[in-house]
Curated annotation (Swiss-Prot):
It comes from Sulfurihydrogenibium sp. (strain YO3AOP1). InterPro entries: DNA-dir_RpoC2_beta_pp (IPR012756), DNA-dir_RpoC_beta_prime (IPR045867), DNA-dir_RpoC_beta_prime_bact (IPR012754), RNA_pol_asu (IPR000722), RNA_pol_N (IPR006592), RNA_pol_Rpb1_1 (IPR007080), RNA_pol_Rpb1_3 (IPR007066), RNA_pol_Rpb1_3_sf (IPR042102). The keyword Metal-binding applies. Disulfide bonds: none annotated. The gene is rpoC. Binds 1 Mg(2+) ion per subunit. Binds 2 Zn(2+) ions per subunit. Zn(2+) 1 binds at residues 65, 67, 80, 83. NCBIfam families: rpoC2_cyan, rpoC_TIGR. Its EC number is 2.7.7.6. This is DNA-directed RNA polymerase subunit beta'. GO terms for biological process: DNA-templated transcription. Mg(2+) binds at residues 601, 603, 605. The lineage of its organism: Bacteria, Pseudomonadati, Aquificota, Aquificia, Aquificales. It comes from the Bacteria.
Amino acid sequence: MEAKERKETVRFDAIRLSLASPEIIRSWSHGEVKKPETLNYRTLKPEKDGLFDARIFGPIKDYECLCGKYKKRKYEGTICDRCGVEVTRSDVRRERFGHIELASPVVHIWYLKSTPSKIGSLLDLTSRDIERVVYFESYLVIEHPTEEEEEAFEKDPKSLPLMEGGLTKYVKLHVVSEDEFREREYEYSNAEKYEYGMGAEKVKDVLARIDLEILAKRLKKDLHGYAGTFDDLNLSYKMNYPRLYNKAIIEIARKFSEVGLRFGDIEPTEKEIDVIISQGYYIVIDPASSDLKFGQIINPENVDSLPEGVIALTGVEALEKLYKAYREKVKEIPIFEVIKESVRNVILKEGTDARLKKIIRRLRLVEGFIESENKPEWMILEVLPVIPPDLRPLIALDGGRFASSDLNDLYRRVINRNNRLKRLIDLDAPEIIIRNEKRMLQEAVDALIDNGRRGRMVTQNNRPLKSLSDSLRGKEGRFRQNLLGKRVDYSGRSVIVVGPELQMHECGLPKQMALELFKPFIYRRLEEKGYATSIKSAKKLVEEKVPEVYECLEEVVKQHPVLLNRAPTLHRMSVQAFEPKLVEGKAIKLHPLVCPPFNADFDGDQMAVHVPLSVEAQLESYILMLSTQNILSPAHGKPVTMPSQDIILGVHYMTQELPNAKGEGKIFGSPEEAVTAYELGTIDLLAKIKVRINGKIVETTAGRIIFNQILPEGYKFVNEVLDKKKISKLISDIYEKYGNEIAAQTLDKIKEIGFRFATKAAVSISVADLVVPKKKAKILEKAIKEAETVWKQYVDGIITKGERHNKIIDIWSQATNEVAKEMFNEIEKSERVENGKKYPGYFNPVYMMASSGARGSRDQIRQLAGMRGLMAKHSGEFIETPIMSNFREGLSVVEYFISTYGARKGLADTALKTAVAGYLTRRLADVAQDVIITGEDCGTLKGITVSSIIESGEIVVPFKDRIIGRYTAEDVYDPYTGELLISANEEITEEVVDKFEKAGIEKVKIRSVLTCEMPHGVCAKCYGRDLAQRKLVDIGEAVGIIAAQSIGEPGTQLTMRTFHIGGAATAKEVQTQHKATHDGTVKLQNVKFVVDKKGRKLIINREGSIKILDKEGKTIERFPAPYGAVLYVEDGQEVKEGTILAEWEPFSDPIIAEKGGEVELRDVILDVTLKEERDNITGKTIYTITFLRPKDAQLHTPRLVIKGEDGNEYVYDLPVNTILLIPKENLEEVWDKCFACSEAEKTDIHHKYLQVKKGFKVSEGDVVAKIPKEKAKVRDIVGGLPRVEELLEAREPKNKAIITEIDGIVKIYEDAKEITLINPKEGKTETYKVPDTTFVIVKNGSFVKAGQSLVDDGSIVAEFDGMVRLKSEGSRIVVFNKETGQQKDYKVPKGKFIIVKDNSVVKAGDPLTDGTPNPHDILRVMGIEELAAFLVKEAQIVYRLQGVEINDKHFEVIIRQILRKVKIVDPGDSRFLLNEIVDKLDLEEEINKVISEGGRPPKAEPVLVGITKAALTTRSWISAASFQETTRVLADAAVEGKVDPLKGLKENVIIGGIIPAGTGIKEYSEVEVVLKEEEKEEV
């Protein structure tokens, strides 16, 4: 049978949205609606000229006019002469528009009240002003220029070009209130000068007259100034942009004088620079042998008479040459780039973001209108379309009442007001009444289009009416409710029960459901077999449920797959295809192995069934969606269709060995012989026996032999105890070697054997199985003692509250772990006797369940038989008192109360966080939905470099896991032999990875979607292997959606899992030391240390690292050397595995004395920069640095100074929260005058300073102060999801680190605007202002001698001896690079901790202060690859903590999407604007276009946008509108006349097309499926 021809829908490739002109609206309409009436209450027929008029909208019954004169189809197309209704289908009432002719124009509210207002932007008025005009509160006055003013108007950026009689004139718009209007007497003044009006009418008039072309030119010119660079400076630039020009030349003059360059004898000022650039004056670059001086300025008239050989130039080029010649003369590297950059920055700074954004916004809008050929006046409505009546139905309820759509109400108000306004105008009513009516009409139309945007119309019972916009937006709107999520016919749902007898590709379908779902197929089969003659009789048979029906049902269902789906559908494995087997009863039977992918259990879950109808759909279900095709997860490539619980327990039990069991030590000639012996009862299932297998004698058990019999033929003999992980590996391996069919069969066999032996093992749980460890009491006693010691330290004031908390948490975490360890040890050692057999401890049922991975975790058993341990508060902090009992002993009342905390948090979290995770998934899917594999190979040479991930010295993700299945980006050679291991663009397979490991290769450059160069979508080689199929990804695979699901699904899952543990928190054990994990030689790289009194080596810098080298000198391990750590090894020392290299105190950062000497505190003032806290519990005093008022932070800089024995001062900044560790008896409080405060307040102010008593010294290596770290908190994904969101939304972190943009050497200065020098004895004070370019080289509170330089360039010198006071705002870190001469200056606010030292060497991208790195900074400084690596690493940390595996490539896909945009830094000759953010694709197209026309291409830099913004700024307006902010997206798209190229998935779903992925891509669209009858059985 040939496939039936289907009626093809019109294929189209793109959809354009634009504004409708009044003519277009009238052309849609079938008639004008003049009356607000709907139906006649007696006849219930529509009223003539009303909102449901059949003459306008079409007949109510099919092929029947209203009066009933014409009935039947033969009259189709006739218009009834009596009632005027066309005889046609009643469906036309769903598609025919009407219209209302408005008596006065009305503004479309979308264009008035959007932010920013479109009309406002166009007229350069604020949205508030436009509103006042539209709602008749103010006048719009147009000021025309007089002849004298014309030129001034033209230059004024505030004027607007309007067309009048073919000419364009510049006018000014004023919005004037009524009172002002009367005062100014505009009415009576010059009619040619002023024109005025109110309401939408006047606005329309102005909009219609705007000359868009000229406005665009003018805006471009304004923008052009801000794109100016050094090379653009000339006379015309000066004329056009005087302000920018002046700023630039002042900057050049400043830079020239900084380097000491002179024009002859003259100091360079802006005057000299100006004459050279704009007035044609020359400068001498090379005086040759003449008397002229280098740099001398020459009048243009005298140039011709210059002596021979003299080189003189003019313009900006002259300045550049002069500068370079000068720098070469003084033997310095010429870096004119620095000047160019600073000129560029000065000009850019003038174009503040707001100013530039506004111009760009206006220009975009104007160009949008020009390109789309929309007219601005179409934003004002003259004609209002009336949507078809069946889309706003009026339904008769019983009892003679009607339910009506809100739209009818809204339309009625519009018509009423419109008719009243017409009447008033005809009656020539007073202006004020007409004005009021016009305003009311405007409000009525506003409410119809978007109710609630301005004012809110409500029903009688105060419910806001649902307007047209409301029916589009939000979850219940048209897009999300009806277009993206349709309900499907041929589906049903029911409860699921387990079906262990099924095969893996089958499900049990209740006969009742099947009968309903397959009805049409059954009818057909009944007719074919001659049981029924017509559909009608077939229907009857089915209703009567005769036996023949069931016979046909069996045949129809055979080989017809159905789809099963379990909500929530979080990833593609939540919908799978099965072959139905008919079952009695009403429940769907589900195969137990497919529960994990569905996340289903049998405690009342329901599932939905869908029937694929067409042959193509059935084929796709079979080939792609059958459950046997979904064994591996697309998120990480490991099996997800997996045995669990009982099955695992059974397999675990049958592969155990039982010592001294019956028949131990017997020898068998073949596996079959051994199995027979077991079946005859001669040997025990678990007895150790010897068997000849493949010619070798193997020691094994009968159980293992039975297990091996179900494995595929030729698979190696598995001779070990199996648990969940090993079974997963086994399945993975079988899949790899034998393909998915064999894997599926093996899974089925494992299921059967697992259930069988779980039954035989009869493992059950009993209270006696929970062994409470004997050593528990001792461990607890020890922990209690330790905790008491910590309390004592706290009471004695040695440690702070925070440190006490952290230490106690650490003690109890360790104690809990020890108890658990002991418990498991005891369980393993304890023997039990059953039926005369001795079973070792590992046969303890509870232990077996946990160790096999069948159910429960070590944590849960710990709570049952060990101790419950620490509990978390709802805030995530730990409660210091742990629960020492376990569930077997029972909890005390207090313990029970403490544990309710966590349990309740779990339940509350589950409810709240599910929504958060769901929303994250939705944003991810939206941003990545159009990433599809569109080609085999894009041919790029780029890639990213990957290596293993190491966290605190441990390999968390091995190298091979990161590269397997990816493609190389370049050839890889063996570093020792030089042989080629793999060429570029080849797949990295398991064999290749082994080669890499042998050759010791630790990093390799691989292809990645981040660097893929496909214009749309990505190519297969950049993506690599499809994780679920273990082969190169297919063209057409929707990898974007898969990425979104893989990242979103665990988020949703994990937030639902919190409450299972019941709040029992596990603190991450704190790392306090580095241990060598290999033997080798120690290499200390850049580690500086001091030796303290006890002879310990303390590390005193942060950039060092400790390496372990092997015999060849290759680095095998690398540990960061933390500041303040005690170093236990020497450089070059040989160490064994397990040697402690360094150890540190984890709960605070110390400040260590680098040298011994006297101590002095500066600016440490009680109640100003220091708070004295007395602990109520301990009675001890703790001094903590803090700023009590923000103002204090500017005036004071707390510091600790050690006057070293070597005569140098060692200064340490004390950041906020620092705790002083100088013993209280060595401190004293001294009242003294504070010069900084006195200066600021202009009156004498005294403070209480904390000072160190004379004679108190510290030794080298003493800890003088410490900065405590945060309290330990529970890290679960609920804390982690917001972090993932922060990363993917590209938000700036709250406490962001400052990072350096260049390599270089660090210098740290005070960031002070003024220096005050004070000599109290002589009563002298002197204040110096510090320019931005100079750096203060003296510290606050230091003493200086007369004549000493206070700043780096020597421009400020102390006039007398005295003390320095700085009005400081923090520090300035300057990074200087000697090679390039580049210098960057960073301001660090007070209280932020600087982690670099003076003169330390930094690399671009290194952090200078503490805090979280800001991704935008990383992108700017280090580029896309580093940023991507950072985002992937940070996001993976969150998931890894939860034990969730997600392949890196999924994050890469999302990151590719949020890096799609670039910011234009130089528009060149392109259509782009300065600072505009555009799509990379658009940029590339434009660059090619500009180059082909011989222009200057634009330059751009990458920007990072968050996932929400990326989804909203996608090229498809349909997709963006269905995501968020629907009305705004649609309004913008309409004005610009945007075209949607329909390249993504969502937009095609919305228009009802086939999605361009999988079999829907263009390549497959021509394929036709032909079925031949006899082949059908084998489909």
